[in-house]
C-alpha cells in the first residue's frame, strides 16, 4: 500500500463513516476504481478505530454521564435515571453484531466485498432509508427507549457488516421506524457502534499487515497515520452531520447512494472495473 492510498482512503473513511452512505462500501469502490485492488476488510476495520475515537471524543461528556449514572444505578439504590437505562440499552444493542460478526467474519473479509454486492446494497438500502424518513413519527425521546428498541437497532447495525449498507444508515433508519427523531436515532446509533467497532478494529489489527485473501497490506506507520487522519476528518464529519440532521432530511443521501451505486454497476457491466 502506497502513502497516497493511505491518505486518500483515510480521508474517505473519515468523511463517510458517520454519513448514511457506507464508509466500507466507499473504501471498497475507491480502492478498486483508483488503485485496482481492494483495501481489505482488515485495513478498513483498523482505519475505523480513528473515526470511532473521534465519536468517543465528541460524545465524551455524554459517555461520562451515562457511565456515572450506570454505575450509580448498579450499585446504589433509588430511582434509576434515563442515562442508567441508556447504558443498558447500549450494552444489549451491542450483542447482536458481536455474535454475528464473529460467526461470519470470514465471509465479511472476502465474499461480502464483491462490488456487485456493494453497489446493489448501496441502491437497495437507499429505499429503506427513504421509507424510514417518510414513515418515521420522530416524536419519541431518550427516556422513552426500551430494551426492545435496543435489540431492534442492534440487529439493524448487523446489516452494516455488508459493505454498501451503512452502519449509520441502518441504525438511524431503525430508529426512525421506531419513532425516534433524527438526532436521537443518530446519537443512539453512534453510541451503539463504539464498542463494536473498537473490538472489530483491535481484532483485525494483526490481519491488516497480512490481509486474509485479497487486499492491500499496510505497515505500522501507515496504519498509525491512517488512524490519525480518519480521527481528524471523522470528528469534523460527525459534528457537521448532527447539525445537518436537525434541519434536513436524509433524502439528500438517498439520491447520492442511488447515483453512486448505478455508476458502479455500469462500470462493472462494461468491464471497466473488476468486481473482486
Curated annotation (Swiss-Prot):
It is a multi-pass membrane protein. GO terms for biological process: cell wall organization; peptidoglycan biosynthetic process; regulation of cell shape; response to antibiotic. Its EC number is 3.6.1.27. It catalyses: di-trans,octa-cis-undecaprenyl diphosphate + H2O = di-trans,octa-cis-undecaprenyl phosphate + phosphate + H(+). It holds the Pfam family BacA. Keywords: Antibiotic resistance, Cell membrane, Cell shape, Cell wall biogenesis/degradation, Hydrolase, Membrane, Peptidoglycan synthesis, Transmembrane, Transmembrane helix. GO terms for molecular function: undecaprenyl-diphosphatase activity. The chain crosses the membrane at residues 1-21, 39-59, 84-104, 115-135, 159-179, 190-210, 222-242, 253-273. The keyword rRNA-binding does not apply. It is found in: Cell membrane. GO terms for cellular component: plasma membrane. Catalyzes the dephosphorylation of undecaprenyl diphosphate (UPP). Confers resistance to bacitracin. Bacitracin is thought to be involved in the inhibition of peptidoglycan synthesis by sequestering undecaprenyl diphosphate, thereby reducing the pool of lipid carrier available. Belongs to the UppP family. HAMAP family: Undec_diphosphatase. This is Undecaprenyl-diphosphatase. The lineage of its organism: Bacteria, Bacillati, Actinomycetota, Actinomycetes, Mycobacteriales.
Amino acid at each position: 500500500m502506497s502513502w497516497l492510498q493511505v491518505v486518500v482512503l483515510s480521508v474517505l473513511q473519515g468523511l463517510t463513516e458517520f454519513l448514511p452512505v457506507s464508509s466500507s462500501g466507499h473504501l471498497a469502490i475507491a480502492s478498486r476504481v483508483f488503485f485496482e485492488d481492494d483495501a481489505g476488510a482488515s485495513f478498513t476495520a483498523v482505519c475505523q478505530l480513528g473515526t470511532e475515537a473521534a465519536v468517543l471524543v465528541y460524545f465524551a461528556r455524554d459517555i461520562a454521564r451515562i457511565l456515572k449514572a450506570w454505575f450509580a444505578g448498579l450499585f446504589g439504590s433509588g430511582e434509576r435515571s434515563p442515562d442508567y437505562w441508556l447504558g443498558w440499552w447500549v450494552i444489549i444493542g451491542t450483542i447482536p453484531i458481536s455474535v454475528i460478526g464473529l460467526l461470519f467474519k470470514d465471509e465479511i473479509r472476502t465474499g461480502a466485498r464483491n462490488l456487485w454486492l456493494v453497489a446493489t446494497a448501496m441502491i437497495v438500502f437507499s429505499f429503506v432509508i427513504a421509507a424510514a424518513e417518510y414513515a418515521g413519527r420522530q416524536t419519541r425521546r431518550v427516556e422513552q427507549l426500551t430494551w426492545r428498541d435496543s435489540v431492534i437497532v442492534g440487529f439493524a447495525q448487523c446489516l452494516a457488516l455488508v459493505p454498501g449498507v451503512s452502519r449509520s444508515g441502518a441504525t438511524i433508519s431503525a430508529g426512525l421506524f421506531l419513532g425516534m427523531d433524527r438526532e436521537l436515532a443518530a446519537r443512539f446509533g453512534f453510541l451503539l457502534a463504539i464498542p463494536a467497532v473498537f473490538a472489530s478494529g483491535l481484532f483485525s489489527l494483526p490481519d491488516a499487515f497480512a490481509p486474509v485473501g485479497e487486499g492491500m497490506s499496510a505497515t505500522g506507520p501507515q496504519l498509525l497515520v491512517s488512524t490519525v487522519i480518519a480521527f481528524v476528518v471523522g470528528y469534523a464529519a460527525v459534528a457537521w452531520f448532527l447539525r445537518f440532521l436537525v434541519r434536513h432530511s436524509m433524502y439528500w443521501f438517498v439520491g447520492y447512494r442511488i447515483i453512486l451505486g448505478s455508476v458502479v454497476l455500469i462500470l462493472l457491466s462494461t468491464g471497466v472495473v473488476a468486481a473482486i
